[in-house]
Each structure stands twice: as C-alpha cells, then as structure tokens.
From Swiss-Prot:
The lineage of its organism: Eukaryota, Metazoa, Chordata, Craniata, Vertebrata. InterPro entries: MFS_2, MFS_trans_sf. Expressed in the developing nervous system. This is Sodium-dependent lysophosphatidylcholine symporter 1-B. Its main location: membrane. It is a multi-pass membrane protein.
Length: 523
C-alpha cells in the first residue's frame, strides 16, 4: 500500500458520514463559548489591582507600621489582625449581596467593580499617609485599612465570580484563568517593584542601641548618623506616598480595561433559584464535600505562604543582613513566579491539577530550609529566591483553577440550585483572608513578645529565632497539613471531564426546551 493511501480512503469515507445531532450541538456550543485573546487579556488585567495592592500591603505594611509610622508592635498587630479579620467577614457578606443582585444591562458583577473602584483608591492612598497627631494613628490606620479592605472586596468577589460568566466552557475558563494568573503574578511583580524600588531609594538610617555592641564594646555600625533621623524618615514617608499614588493610578486603569473589554454572559443553563439567607449560604457551600476539602487544604497552604510573605522582608534585613537588598530579593521571587505560570498551566493540563498541587506546593520546602541553614550569602539567597518563586506561581494559579471545578460539581449534584457562584468564591476568599489576618497578627505579636526594637540596626537573638520559625518551620508544618487534606479531595481529571459532559447536556436540554416553548408560543 502506498504511503498515505489508507489515510486518504479513510478521510473520504469520513467526509461522507453526517455528524450526529449531539456533535453538531456541541460544536455550535463550543464555538459560541470561545473567548478571544483580547477578551482573555482584558479579563486578566482586571485581576492586577488586587494583587498589586495585596503584594504591597503583604510585604511592606508590617514594616511600614513598625519602622515608618513608628507604632508599637502590639498596636501594629491589632491593626493587621483586625483589618484582615474585617476583610474576611466582608467577603461572604459581599458574596451574599452579589448573589442577590439583579441582572443589569452591564451584567450582575460589573456594577460592583466599577462603583467600588474610586473609593477603594482613595482609602488605599490614605493607608500610606502618616497623620501628624500621634494619638490618632492607630484609629487612622484601622479606619482606612478596614474601609479599603471592604471596598476592595466589593471589587474582587464579583471579579472572582466573573470567571463563571465569561464562558460556559471549562477549557475556556481554564485558559482565561491562566491568563489571569499570569497577569496577577505580574501584578505582584509590579507591586513589589514599585513599592520596593521607590521606597528603597529613600532608606532612613537605623538607630543604634545597646544590642549593637560587639564583644569589644564598639558599635557594629558606627557610621550611622542619627543626629537628625527625622529628615530621612520624612523622605521615607514621602516615598511610600509616591508609591501608593502610582499604584492607585494603575488600579483605575485596570478597572477601566476590564469594564470595556469583557462582556458578562448570562448563564442559560437554568433559571436562578430563589435567593437564600446568609446562613443558608454558609450551610450550602460548606456542606458540599469537595468544596470543603479544597478550601481547607488551600487554607493551610495559603497560610504558609502568607507567613512567608509577611515576615520575609524583616528576615532579610535582620537575619540575613540585607537591609539595602531585601526589596531586590522580593523582586526576584515575583519575577520567577511570573515566568513560571505558563509552566504550571502546561503541567496541570498534562498531569492533572491534583498532581500539580503536590509538586508545586512541596517545591518551596527546600528554599525554606536553605535560607535558614545556609550561611548568609546574597548570591545563594537570590538563587533560592528564584527557585521559591516557581512554587509561589503554583500557589497563585491552582486555587483559582480548581474552584470552577468544584462549582461545576455542585451544579451537577444540585441541578435545581443555581446562581450561587459568588457565594462559593466569597467564602474561599473569606477563609484565606482570615488566615492572612491570623498570620500577620500572630507574627507581629510574636515579634513584640520577643522584644522587637523599632528601627533597630540589629535585633535580639529571640527576635531572630522567631523570624526563623515564621519563615521556615511554621510554613513547612502548614504545607504538610494542607497536603494531607488534599489526599481526600475527590475531583480528579476523570471526574472533572464527566462533570463537563453532564453540564453540557444540561445546557443543551435547557436550550432545546426554550426553543420548543418559543415555537409553541408562535403556533
């Protein structure tokens, strides 16, 4: 037989066969649900503000409150914990309100995103302003931190739930999620670069104390000039305000691009059920086994990365001695994470999302061990930071890639209960933000108990030991707990594809029913 002869015969035979009605419907459905690259990019850009501001707050707010606003560590821990706890409470509340929002000409999610943006930008800017009245600093930061978190929640919860309304196809949603995660990690890179580099150019000198004496009684840092530290401190405060102004401008631009470039699609699968109460929503989402296991697993792994994020700047300054380089180390982590997102998207497509969780999360452990055990070396720290960024990328991508699978599983098991996507997303954000509040509050309070010295050139041994625990031992334990929970997570690739097929059948049946009803009304 000549080469290609059999293939030609097979092709001719295939062309004579008519596709089945189901194949025709599926092809039309997939074509209609396909997203353009432009739409995916505009959708992805909308996720940047949350990550840019979150990265700036996560990496720099703790050190800002301690060494720039000059707050006592105890009050700083209260601000960080109350702000994140309040933020966590607002997530399910906003999710509940979004789920009851009627459909408008702009959709159900877009009005929340647009209206919250200008007020969120104002509150974010005021977080990085130091009021002149010392007695009112704590109240100032509490008010504007909580207000910003509330307004950002009004942006982020609808934006997260928008994933379910940009397309009905899992493949398209996963692709859009990959675009989004790439831009969001790029957003953390931008946030780290803007905040770190602008602030890094205006470093205020540290203050020598009695613990800065070596065994001979001489100061370790005798060249530090503290005759008038207020001048340099004011420059540092101005640098924080400049950085916040730049971030506010980016926030507004991203919101405009999202609004103009993304069209929210109305789900045609089923008519939405009657709105449920807030506590009914809690029972509904937590009563769905796959969702509860997914959230609990990522709760512990996210807490590990949040502990690392919140304390790594202090660890670089006081344990590793990189006071003038810590912002560059953070930048390397975020740059590596940005570059690794396409790899993890390919990996989860090739080997499955559950496998990606195990490989991606555990890859950070060697970094956590090396930064504590290996003697301080800037070159080694850069290499380890680049390797850690690969794991950070997985931590960004996987939760948002797996949440739509859980929502789809709920729809398959509860076909009569629809329109609750925002509740699922908001409760996930609630748990992760609550974990973030706990991590920041506990870590800052631990530093207070250990004897943290505000703007000190060095710190007591107890503080350095506490920082080692917060960036190494504690995250490793939390990662292990999270991975043990993921063992019982039931949605594998086979289950996911089965749910996809069932949902497509539901949508096709619903569209057929609507078509039949229309024809009967015409007759």
């Amino acid at each position: 037989m000549a080469k290609g002869e059999g293939a030609e015969q097979y092709t001719n035979t295939s062309l004579l066969q008519k596709p089945s009605p189901d194949e025709v419907k599926l092809a039309k459905h997939e074509t209609k649900s396909r997203l353009s690259v432009c739409s995916k990019l505009c959708y992805a850009i909308g996720g940047a503000p949350y990550q840019i501001t979150g990265c700036a707050i996560g990496f720099f707010l703790q050190i800002y409150l301690l060494d720039v606003a000059l707050l006592d560590p105890f009050y700083a821990s209260i601000i960080l914990f109350v702000g994140r706890a309040w933020d966590a409470v607002t997530d399910p509340t906003v999710g509940f309100l979004v789920s009851r929002t009627p459909w408008t000409r702009f959709g159900r999610m877009m009005p929340w995103i647009v209206l919250s943006t200008p007020f969120a930008v104002l509150c974010y800017f005021l977080i990085w302003y130091v009021p002149s009245v010392d007695q009112g600093k704590v109240v100032w930061y509490l008010i504007f931190y909580c207000c910003f978190q509330t307004l950002q929640t009004c942006f982020h919860v609808p934006y997260s739930a928008l994933t379910m309304f940009i397309s009905t196809e899992q493949k398209e949603r996963d692709s859009a999620t990959a675009y989004r995660m790439t831009v969001e990690v790029l957003g953390t890179l931008i946030g780290t670069a803007i905040q770190g580099q602008i602030v890094g150019m205006a470093n205020a000198p540290c203050i020598s104390t009695e613990i800065d004496l070596n065994s001979t009684g001489l100061e370790v840092a005798p060249d530090v000039n503290i005759t008038d530290p207020h001048v340099s401190l004011q420059d540092l405060r101005n640098a924080y305000m400049i950085a916040s102004g730049v971030i506010c401008a980016i926030y507004v631009v991203c919101a405009v691009v999202l609004f103009l470039g993304v069209k929210e699609q109305k789900d045609t699968c089923r008519v939405r059920t009657e709105p449920m109460s807030f506590f009914q929503g809690i029972c509904m989402v937590m009563g769905h086994g796959p969702y509860a296991k997914l959230v609990m697993g990522f709760l512990f792994t996210s807490l590990a990365f949040m502990l690392l994020e919140g304390n790594f700047a202090l660890f670089c300054i006081y344990n590793l001695g990189f006071r003038n380089d810590f912002q560059n180390v953070l930048l390397v982590i975020m740059l590596s994470a940005t570059l690794a997102i396409p790899f993890w998207q390919w990996f989860l497509t090739k080997f499955g999302k559950k496998t990606a969780v195990y490989i991606g999360t555990t890859s950070v452990v060697p970094f956590l061990i090396s930064v504590v055990l290996v003697p301080s070396s800037l070159a080694v720290t850069y290499i380890a930071s680049f390797a850690a960024g690969v794991s950070v990328a997985a931590a960004f991508l996987l939760p948002w890639s797996m949440l739509p699978d859980v929502v789809d599983d709920f729809k398959v098991q509860n076909p009569e209960s629809q329109g609750h996507e925002a509740i699922f997303y908001s409760f996930y954000v609630f748990f992760t933000k609550f974990a973030s509040g706990v991590s920041l509050g506990v870590s800052t309070l631990s530093l207070d108990f250990a004897g943290y010295v505000t703007r000190g050139c060095t710190q007591p041994g107890e503080v350095k030991l506490t920082l080692k625990i917060l960036v190494s031992a504690a995250p490793i334990v939390l990662i292990i707990i999270g991975l043990l929970i993921f063992i019982s997570y039931p949605i594998n690739e086979e289950k996911r594809q089965g749910n996809r097929k069932l949902l497509n059948e539901q949508r096709e049946n619903e569209m057929d029913s609507e078509t039949d009803s229309t024809e009967l009304n015409v007759v």
